[in-house]
């Protein structure tokens, strides 16, 4: 469980799912339910097999107590995995720490914790404190079941029953209480840490989490020049830059403005490290993009293209300024923006064990496609990126070439008819024929949506663009 959760963070698959419209609640319920079902199936076979081969541990003790004990522990184990996963972004480190915990708690439980349990002079309060560790609480429960099974078998009687929970020397009742309380607390803490943690590339904000519990009211469209009282050095701007900025200001003052994307003085500064100065990546970007148009950015690495995309898709927060997608503020309404947004990230975020078709089915369902419309959308997407014929779409993504993965990422960004699409260097790794096919796909797709493209190549398809900007050096400040 731990490695599975951390893997999705490390590969940024969780972020990708969120950007395609999967909310945190359904993600948690689906993941929790998946782990719970697997654990219940495993534990059921474990108990049945132990009973069939005649182990007194299972046969003598009450099955009702065993069911309750294993049920509570399974839920505690899942909550604990979610909690611990919030501290890791590397599968290797998480796996090593996980094995150390399992073997360490097992060895300490068998040699040290058991000694404390059987020592009548050892304070019972300290036993309860030690049982906060899930591994020790599991060992204590198994120890009690084992002791009652042994004594019951020796005396020809039953093992642990519900009546035995009242025995002063029986620690099972305390164990069940401790694990139940810890399960609830661990689940709340795990969800909180998941929301506020920035580990794994997501944006974390403790205050934002508490705001999410309240009803959100996005501020009205208003120029950040008014909000920040920020004066721009106009003499540094070219004529077309100044004109676009004026257009944005006018649109922000118009309550009936219907633009797919409006960027208002969007700015991103990365703090300097090791004594280096701050890095200005995006300086005062103002942009208005209506539906049916495509905006392209061309420039070298470090010009601010990915920084701009990252702010627009919610991976990083703007230092100042803001942007609106169909009137929704990226600072407050990202969850709503995600439902109408498609993203082709700079690096392919895919499951190696799933097929291309399974990827598209999954993301299409997130966009509420069902039935015949779902199947048609998936097949059309595979055909558009040349992954349909020859059964390519039914092969695992791990067997795809780099270009095939890139084409699949493009298909994912367009499935479900998103109203706004961001493609960060979508032509990377594509041969000339595939690149030309990509531009044809974009040309067809832009009719019903606004598209933002970035690229490093001089072969950027300027005829496709209604607006484009060439970045000779960072920072990117306006079109």
Give the residues covered by each predicted segment.
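Generic alpha-helical segment signature
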Residues: 6, 77, 256-260, 374
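Flexible, active-site-proximal loop/turn residues at the rims of small-molecule/cofactor binding pockets
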Residues: 33, 272, 474
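Membrane-spanning alpha-helical segments of multipass transporters and channels
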Residues: 1-14, 20-224
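ABC-family P-loop ATPase nucleotide-binding domain
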Residues: 189, 193-279
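ABC transporter nucleotide-binding domains
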Residues: 259-464, 470
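Acidic-residue sensor for enzyme active/binding pockets
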Residues: 8, 237-239, 244, 358, ...
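H-loop (His-switch) and adjacent beta-strand-loop-beta switch element
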Residues: 467-479
């Amino acid at each position: 469980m731990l490695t599975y959760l951390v893997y999705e963070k490390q590969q940024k698959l969780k972020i990708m799912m969120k950007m395609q419209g999967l909310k945190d609640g359904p993600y948690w319920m689906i993941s929790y339910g998946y782990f719970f079902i697997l654990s219940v199936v495993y534990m059921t076979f474990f108990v049945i097999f132990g009973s069939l081969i005649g182990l007194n541990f299972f046969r003598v003790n009450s099955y009702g107590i065993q069911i309750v004990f294993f049920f509570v522990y399974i839920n505690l184990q899942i909550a604990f995995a979610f909690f611990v996963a919030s501290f890791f972004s590397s599968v290797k480190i998480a796996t090593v720490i996980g094995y150390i915990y399992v073997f360490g708690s097992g060895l300490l439980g068998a040699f040290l914790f058991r000694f404390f349990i059987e020592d009548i002079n050892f304070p019972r309060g300290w036993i309860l404190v030690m049982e906060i560790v899930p591994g020790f609480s599991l060992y204590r429960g198994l120890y009690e079941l084992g002791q009652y099974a042994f004594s019951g078998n020796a005396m020809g009687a039953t093992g642990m029953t519900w009546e035995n929970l009242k025995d002063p020397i029986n620690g099972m009742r305390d164990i069940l209480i401790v694990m139940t309380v810890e399960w609830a607390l661990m689940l709340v803490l795990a969800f909180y840490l998941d929301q506020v943690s920035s580990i794994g590339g997501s944006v974390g904000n403790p205050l934002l989490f508490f705001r999410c519990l309240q009803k959100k009211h996005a501020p009205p469209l208003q120029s950040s020049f008014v909000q920040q009282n920020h004066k721009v050095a106009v003499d540094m701007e070219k004529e077309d830059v100044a004109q676009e900025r004026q257009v944005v200001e006018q649109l922000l003052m118009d309550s009936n403005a219907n633009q797919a994307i409006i960027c208002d003085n969007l700015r991103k500064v990365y703090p300097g490290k090791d004594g280096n100065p701050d890095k200005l990546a995006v300086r005062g970007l103002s942009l208005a993009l209506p539906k049916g148009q495509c905006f392209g950015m061309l420039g070298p690495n470090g010009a601010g293209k990915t920084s701009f995309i990252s702010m627009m898709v919610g991976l990083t927060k703007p230092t100042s300024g803001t942007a609106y997608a169909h009137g929704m503020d990226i600072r407050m309404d990202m969850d709503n923006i995600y439902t109408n947004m498609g993203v082709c990230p700079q690096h392919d975020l895919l499951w190696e064990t799933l097929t291309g078709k399974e990827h598209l089915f999954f993301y299409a369902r997130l966009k509420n496609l069902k039935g015949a419309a779902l199947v048609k959308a998936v097949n059309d997407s595979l055909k558009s990126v040349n992954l349909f014929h020859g059964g390519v779409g039914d092969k695992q993504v791990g067997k795809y070439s780099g270009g095939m993965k890139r084409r699949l990422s493009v298909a994912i960004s367009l499935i479900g008819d998103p109203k706004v699409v961001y493609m960060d260097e979508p032509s990377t790794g594509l041969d000339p024929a595939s690149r030309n096919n990509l531009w044809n796909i974009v040309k067809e797709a832009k009719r019903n949506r606004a598209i933002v493209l970035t690229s490093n190549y001089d072969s950027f398809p300027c005829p496709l663009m209604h607006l484009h900007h060439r970045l000779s050096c960072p920072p990117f400040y306006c079109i």
